[in-house]
Amino acid sequence: MIVLDTHALLWMDRDDPALGAASRRLIEDAWRAGQVAVSAISFWETAMLVQRGRIVLPLPTTEWRSELLQAGLREIVMEGRIGILATQLENMHRDPADRFIIATALQNQATLVTADENVLAWPSELLRQDARL
């Protein structure tokens, strides 16, 4: 399974060239197997970006989310184990959304697709793919 960071989700949805060829292939292969997921916090993050006028979606956020889920994207809800794990990520910056997304990937033994330099450089057992590659 792969977990998309919020920006990777947006890049995938928009067919943004910022999403690298290797990551695109990884996502496409995982999509066919029904193994592409996001943390529920990514929908919160996206809604906040829309509300602040930093991005525009083709649909209202609720409908956009529904379409992605109907197309096969898996949403992993934030449960207690993920919340606790998010507090235990040593040497990770304090951004709670990043912590929840990382904890979601770790809890599900998934590869996180991200372009976040801090996450990519973080020394840990987290499996990760640079979304730009």
Where are the predicted features?
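Short, well-structured N-terminal submotif of metal-dependent ribonuclease cores
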Residues: M1-V38, R52-S66, Q70, E117, ...
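Phosphate/NTP-binding elements of NTP-utilizing enzymes
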Residues: T46
